[in-house]
């Protein structure tokens, strides 16, 4: 989940 990880500030896909 790129959206969720994006909100966490992670660069994971």
UniProtKB/Swiss-Prot annotation:
GO cellular component: extracellular region
Keywords (A to Z) from UniProt: Cell wall, Secreted
Keyword match Secreted: yes
Compartments, as annotated in UniProt: Secreted, Cell wall
Record keyword Secreted present: yes
Listed name of the protein: 27 kDa cell wall protein
The organism of origin for this protein: Solanum lycopersicum
């Amino acid at each position: 989940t790129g959206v969720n990880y994006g909100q966490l500030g992670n660069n994971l896909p």
